[in-house]
């Protein structure tokens, strides 16, 4: 039995778009301040045909729903240049304390890159962490983050589409249990 509580770390790893494998010298971004990750299944809904007489149902033929992805909303408590660049294609310029984030020009189109998303969630027994559930989405592409700026803290919400990594022959999602978190 797993008792999962609190996202401990999120790792985004750039993929080679032709092979689906991790890109050599690709971007790897780590989030240690993730607040929430919502995974909504994307389904191709099956059909249901009913054959009936005026006063009774004679037969029902159904085809199953099939999953072909997840739509993910990842909320972070900080705004990371590496994450924004990988997920949404932001260009980052300037010095570390005075960085400038810019969306691509319209003529450039979308410049986000495909990536793998690993979400690590603590697994508890009593009051102790025994290991971590590693939720892996094997092929993702992002959108520009939603911005809600007001009286409170700004927390970017990254919208991500996770699909099967056909090139690498990997499923949409995998869940494994690991003993430790990866090093930064």
Summary of predicted features, one role per range:
Residues 1-86, 138-150:
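Solvent-exposed edge beta-strands and adjacent loop segments
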Residues 18-28, 120-131, 172-180, 184:
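Acidic Ser/Thr/Pro-rich low-complexity disordered segments
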Residues 35-37, 94-100, 106-129, 160, ...:
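Surface-exposed, low-hydrophobicity beta-strand/loop segments enriched in small/polar/acidic residues
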Residues 42-49, 87-93, 106-110, 128-135:
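N-terminal start-of-chain detector that recognizes signal peptides
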Residues 64-118:
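Extracellular-facing segments of soluble proteins and assemblies that are Gly/Ser/Thr-biased and enriched
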Residues 64-65, 104-109, 127, 144-155:
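Exposed beta-sheet edge/beta-hairpin loop segments within beta-rich domains
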Residues 82-86, 91, 127-129, 145-147, ...:
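Short acidic, gly/pro-rich beta-turn/loop elements at beta-sheet edges
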Residues 131-184:
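Mixed-charge, glycine-accented linear interaction segment located at domain edges/termini
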């Amino acid at each position: 039995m797993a008792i999962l509580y609190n996202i401990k770390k999120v790792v985004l790893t750039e993929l080679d778009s032709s092979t689906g494998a991790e890109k050599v010298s690709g971007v790897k971004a780590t989030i240690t301040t993730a607040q929430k990750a919502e995974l909504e299944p994307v389904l191709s809904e099956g059909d249901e045909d009913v054959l009936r007489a005026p006063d009774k149902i004679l037969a029902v033929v159904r085809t199953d729903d099939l999953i072909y992805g997840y739509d993910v909303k990842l909320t972070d408590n900080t705004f990371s240049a590496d994450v924004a660049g990988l997920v949404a294609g932001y260009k980052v310029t300037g010095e570390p304390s005075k960085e400038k984030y810019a969306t691509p020009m319209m003529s450039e189109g979308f410049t986000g890159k495909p990536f793998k998303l690993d979400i690590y969630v603590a697994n508890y027994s009593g009051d102790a962490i025994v290991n971590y559930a590693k939720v892996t989405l094997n092929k993702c592409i992002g959108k520009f983050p939603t911005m809600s700026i007001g009286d409170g803290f700004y927390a970017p919400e990254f919208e991500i589409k996770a699909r099967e990594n056909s090139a690498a022959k990997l499923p949409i999602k995998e869940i494994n249990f690991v003993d430790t978190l990866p090093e930064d």
